[in-house]
């Protein structure tokens, strides 16, 4: 479909791979493009692409205004989240944390991968720290006005978590109940997730990855800076590996995701944008390969690199990572909550924009009672 090709070519341009546009913008079905761009969290990239190709004036004016508003909102939120993460870096350091914490994902990726505009859409700040630092972190966040709980989507009201809910969540997972700082204008609301391990999702009763010692993430930390803001984070090589493993776990363990059947969080182009922008960076690939072997996550990299190449065959990979290109059929799988490995009946390129077909495929091959979404 021309609309799908348009979106893929848009990302090629973002990666610096020049491709031609075969179909004029005014001949495309923008209902499809806007729907898919929203689901894949790439509306800011879409607006950037229209401006880069000098085609913004050719689309419907109301669509243009909507995309521009989304672009400006994402730009504001990105800068605001970076500023908040920088402030929290200072506050945590002032409260005897020293360097036993780092920020993950969101603002770190935004600063390091920066393609010249705020391409990432993220709503929370993820912090990795030692579990013994949790009490100190809670006190710091509380003094700054943060409360643990959740937002009711139907009423937009904040519901504070009970002590029982907080303890149960910390006991049963790798993270705390989310911390919210609520403002009168919700555009300024901030969510902080505190994690005390990198990965916790399991393939049935077994860990998807061997436990990763987080001490090296603290020991080898660096500071990511932009516009006088400074955020503590892992080295770029560690961030790259964590980003790939996060994509992999979301892609193969989506049966654990709440309401996957309507959110389709297993496959989003924004996650592959992160990978593509990383691959354009000059990482220390000898270190990357050493860490992959140390963490014993070769299977995950077989999956990520092969699937990335399947979606973007024109992208030239770093030579060192070509060892992870496998037969695409061998990495076209997911796990049920019972730990069974199931194979898709379609390729990743075929189901990338066919969300409902993914659901039908999973329901055909997986007992409905094995899907977490159907248990809730």
Report each predicted region and the residues it spans:
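Conserved NTP-donor binding/palm subdomain of two-metal-ion nucleotidyltransferases/polymerases, i.e.
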Residues: 1-123, 129-376
């Amino acid at each position: 479909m021309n609309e799908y090709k348009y979106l893929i070519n848009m990302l090629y341009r973002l990666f610096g791979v020049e491709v031609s546009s075969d179909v004029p913008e005014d001949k495309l079905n923008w209902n499809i493009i806007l729907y898919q761009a929203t689901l894949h969290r790439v509306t800011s990239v879409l607006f950037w692409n229209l401006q880069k190709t000098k085609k913004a004036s050719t689309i419907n004016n109301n669509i243009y205004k909507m995309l521009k508003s989304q672009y400006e909102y994402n730009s504001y939120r990105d800068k605001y989240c970076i500023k908040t993460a920088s402030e929290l870096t200072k506050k945590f350091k002032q409260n005897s944390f020293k360097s036993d914490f780092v920020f993950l994902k969101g603002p770190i990726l935004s600063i390091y991968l920066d393609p010249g505009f705020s391409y990432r859409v993220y709503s929370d700040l993820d912090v990795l720290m030692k579990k013994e630092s949790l009490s100190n972190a809670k006190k710091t966040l509380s003094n700054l006005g943060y409360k643990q709980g959740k937002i009711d989507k139907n009423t937009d009201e904040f519901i504070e978590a009970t002590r029982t809910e907080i303890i149960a969540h910390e006991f049963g997972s790798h993270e705390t109940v989310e911390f919210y700082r609520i403002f009168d204008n919700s555009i300024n609301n901030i969510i902080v997730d505190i994690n005390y391990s990198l990965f916790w999702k399991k393939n049935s009763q077994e860990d998807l990855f061997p436990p990763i010692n987080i001490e090296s993430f603290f020991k080898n930390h660096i500071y990511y800076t932009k516009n006088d803001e400074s955020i503590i984070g892992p080295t770029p090589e560690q961030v790259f590996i964590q980003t790939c493993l996060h994509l992999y776990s979301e892609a193969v363990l989506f049966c654990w995701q709440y309401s996957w059947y309507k959110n389709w969080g297993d496959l989003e182009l924004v996650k592959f944008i992160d990978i593509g922008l990383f691959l354009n960076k000059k990482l220390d690939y000898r270190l990357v390969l050493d860490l992959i072997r140390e963490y014993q996550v070769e299977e995950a990299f077989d999956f990520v690199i092969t699937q990335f190449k399947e979606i973007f065959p024109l992208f030239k990979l770093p030579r060192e990572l070509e060892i992870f290109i496998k037969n695409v059929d061998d990495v076209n799988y997911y796990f049920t909550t019972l730990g069974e490995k199931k194979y898709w009946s379609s390729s990743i390129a075929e189901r990338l924009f066919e969300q409902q077909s993914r659901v039908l495929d999973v329901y055909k091959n997986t007992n409905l009672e094995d899907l977490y979404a159907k248990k809730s």
